[in-house]
Each structure stands twice: as C-alpha cells, then as structure tokens.
C-alpha cells in the first residue's frame, strides 16, 4: 500500500474528472496564470455560495430528482447522527431545497443515485463518482474508519469471511439483526462484534450500504448494490486521482484558496499555490485575485460564466436559511472566517460548562452573510421548535429587514421539522427576542 503523502503534480496526467476544460464564453486560456481583474470579497463570497446552491432562494417546489442533483453540486453530503434538530444531511438539503420529504434521501440511496463512502468524513456521494472514491480510498486509507477496517481485516478475517458468506446466502443485513450478549461491547463505541465486522467490510469495500431504514444502515455485497463494479475498472495513477478530487473540490467551492482544497475530501498534503500551476496552465482552473486576501483564489473552468457575473456584480444574494454545523460552507473554520468574518466551532463535543453558544449551533445565513447563530431543539411531541439561544454576530446590528428574513427562515424550518410553534427562549442582545416574536407572528399570519 502506498503512503498517504505523495509528491503532487496536478494535471500532468489525464484526469478522470468530467468537468469541461473551458466553459462557454471564458476569457482565460491555458498559458495565462492570473486573471487581470480582481474580485471584491463580497463578489467572491457570492460566487462561493452560488456554487454551493445557497445564494438564491428556491424558486419552485423541490422534486425527488433534486436530491441527487444537490449532492452532485456539492460533490458530497456529510452524514451525522445528532438529531436535536433534523439530522445534518437532511438539514443541509433543506437549506438549499426548502421543504421536501426526508424519505427522498433514502430513496435516492436505495435507487442507486448516490452511495455512501468515506470522503470528507462519512458521506453520501454521487454514484457517478463511485469508482473514483473507491480507488482513492484503496490507495490512501486516509480515514480512521478505513484504518480500523484494515486492523480488523488482519486480526479477524475468518469472522469477516463468515459474515460475508451469511450475507451472500441470506441477503442484506442490519447490525440489529444480530443479538448482542448482555453487557458485552466491542472496542468501537461499545459496538458488538458484528457491527464492527460490518463496518470493517464496508471500509474494505466488500460491502456497501444498500439502503437505510430509520437511518440505520442496511449492508449488502458491493456487487449487488452497484453491479457496475463487476465491469472492468479503469486504472488510475495516483496523480490522476489527486487531480480528479482537486478539481471536484475547487468546482464545489466555487472559489477557494489553495490551502483550503485538501480539506474538502480530506486529501493530503495541504496544497500550495505552486501545486496548482499545471491546472492553471492547462486552463482547467483559473487563478484570480480577491481584494483583502493574502493569497490567490482559484475558480474551476466550469464556473467561468459565473465568475464573469460575479466580477460584473450580477450575482444577487436573496436566500436566508439556517445551516447545519456540517454544511460545507462552515465546516472549514479558517475558510468560513475569511469568507464571512465568522468564527465558528462546533461545541457538541465540548463540556457543557465550557460552551460559548450551545450544543448544536446553527449558523444563520442571510442574503450572502452569516449574521448570527442559534442553538435550537425540535420538541417533536409538543410541536415546538425552541430557540434556546440566539446570538447576533458580534459588531453587527440587525436591520428590520434582516429580522423579518430570519423570522421567516425560522418559521420555514419549524414547519418542515413538524414543530410549527417557534419558541424564543433567549437572544443576545436581549431586545432581538421581542422583534423576532413580532416578526414570527406576521410570518404565521401571512
């Protein structure tokens, strides 16, 4: 197995990425390394949000096909099980699509439009990228889950083979299909042996997730979940895999600095500007200037038309919504700080007495800016969406229009959660609470 960190030479080999080398109307060509026009920070931010599907409010009702399309646009959708409000993958989709039935995500998985993999963390990804992720994971074993799978493979392979034979003969299984001896647990969060073996086989690529039932994984043989794996696979050199994921990350981010690219798919090492020279020279990536940045920005060639709109000031931010802590826009703390002047850290793993904002805090996106954050809990039995604490971004004062936008976004989220009564417990500053309550009454009345 090759080591995780390899010398990179992006673009030297043919890339498996499918994005066009030059978008229609692009003015940037292969040998040119820097765009002569710079962007203002707000223009760069709008380009970032547009690429992520968060710049403009939805203009129509969501359709089932929007689930896979949304994940295709982001290139991945991180999975997390915390559910004081809706679980993160559902919330990330709601931030972009508006109201939709949660079962659409399960249907997209079961129908083979998307699959589960280790990418940024545990993620859903487009089925078109299956071979790319499998090849990269086989090469790098970059995640803790993959490293655990390798250790289990070495230590307990006979058990894995017996479990595989069970699935081959009897069909898909859940970990709950196996009884757990009372009081006995394994090494991974107290998991029983069969759960660890299933996860190991998933990490090894021998099993895939066929579907989810009540968000619980259902495991089956990889070739039954994705029959195309039985077909001959393309051979990719390490540089080709690096290039493909680098291009996908740059495209998903809209505009990025080199040092932020690696975090999107958790590739190694962190990139330097010189690592992207070849892609820039080949015209697959454009190097731009952003006012106030101490480093160049990078835009994928597929976004050339959108970049021109951003520079011309023709991207308009109209969307207000709540974001998941695991939304790609905020999961990189440094990137969120540079784009939005917003210092965000997830505190659910911090001892309660040391938390500043709350357990599961949702950033508030309002027309292209992060203007605050709130700690919420959906009391489903009572039908109440509780805002336990809301903090306005330090140094800012909300306008009446922003209060209205946030109140409407809160009510939309509450309705989608099935908890239509919004309860404001505490805000900072305190006077925001009364203004929000008035705006919420107006939102309900309208």
Predicted ranges, named:
Residues 11-13, 23, 30:
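Short hydrophobic alpha-helical segments enriched in small aliphatic residues
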Residues 8, 28-321, 327-330, 335, ...:
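Long, low-complexity intrinsically disordered regions
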């Amino acid at each position: 197995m090759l080591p995780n960190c390899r010398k990179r030479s992006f673009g030297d080999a043919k890339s498996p990425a499918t994005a066009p080398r030059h978008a229609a109307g692009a003015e940037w060509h292969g040998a040119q390394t820097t765009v002569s026009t710079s962007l203002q920070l707000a223009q760069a931010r709008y380009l970032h949000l547009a690429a992520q599907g968060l710049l403009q409010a939805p203009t129509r009702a969501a359709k089932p096909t929007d689930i896979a399309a949304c994940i295709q646009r982001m290139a991945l959708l991180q999975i997390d099980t915390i559910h004081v409000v809706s679980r993160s993958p559902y919330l990330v989709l709601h931030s972009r699509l508006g109201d939709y039935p949660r079962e659409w995500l399960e249907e997209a998985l079961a129908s083979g439009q998307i699959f589960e993999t280790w990418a940024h963390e545990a993620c859903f990804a487009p089925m078109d990228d299956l071979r790319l992720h499998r090849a990269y994971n086989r090469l790098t074993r970059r995640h803790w889950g993959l490293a655990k799978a390798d250790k289990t493979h070495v230590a307990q392979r006979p058990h894995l083979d017996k479990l595989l034979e069970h699935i081959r003969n009897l069909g898909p299984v859940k970990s709950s299909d196996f009884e757990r001896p009372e009081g006995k647990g394994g090494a991974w969060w107290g998991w029983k042996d069969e759960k660890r073996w299933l996860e190991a086989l998933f990490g090894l690529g021998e099993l895939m997730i066929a579907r989810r039932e009540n968000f619980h994984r259902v495991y089956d043989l990889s070739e039954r979940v994705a029959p195309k794996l039985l077909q001959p696979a393309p051979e990719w050199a390490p540089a080709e895999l690096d290039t493909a994921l680098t291009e996908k990350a740059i495209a998903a981010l809209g505009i990025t600095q080199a040092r932020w690219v690696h975090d999107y798919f958790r590739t190694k090492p962190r990139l330097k500007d010189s690592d992207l020279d070849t892609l820039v020279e080949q015209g697959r990536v454009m190097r731009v200037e952003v006012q106030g940045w101490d480093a160049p920005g990078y835009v994928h060639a597929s976004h050339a038309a959108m970049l021109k709109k951003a520079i011309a000031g023709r991207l308009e931010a109209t969307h207000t919504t709540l974001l998941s802590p695991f939304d790609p826009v905020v999961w990189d703390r440094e990137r969120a700080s540079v784009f939005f002047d917003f210092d965000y850290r997830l505190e659910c793993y911090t001892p309660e007495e040391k938390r500043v904002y709350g357990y599961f805090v949702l950033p508030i996106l309002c027309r292209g800016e992060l203007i605050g954050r709130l700690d919420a809990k959906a009391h489903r039995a009572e039908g109440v969406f509780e805002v336990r604490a809301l903090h306005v971004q330090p140094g800012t004062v909300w306008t009446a229009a922003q209060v209205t936008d946030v109140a409407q976004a809160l009510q939309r989220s509450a309705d989608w959660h099935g908890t239509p009564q919004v309860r404001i417990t505490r805000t900072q500053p305190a006077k925001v609470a009364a203004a929000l309550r008035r705006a919420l009454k107006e939102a309900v009345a309208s």
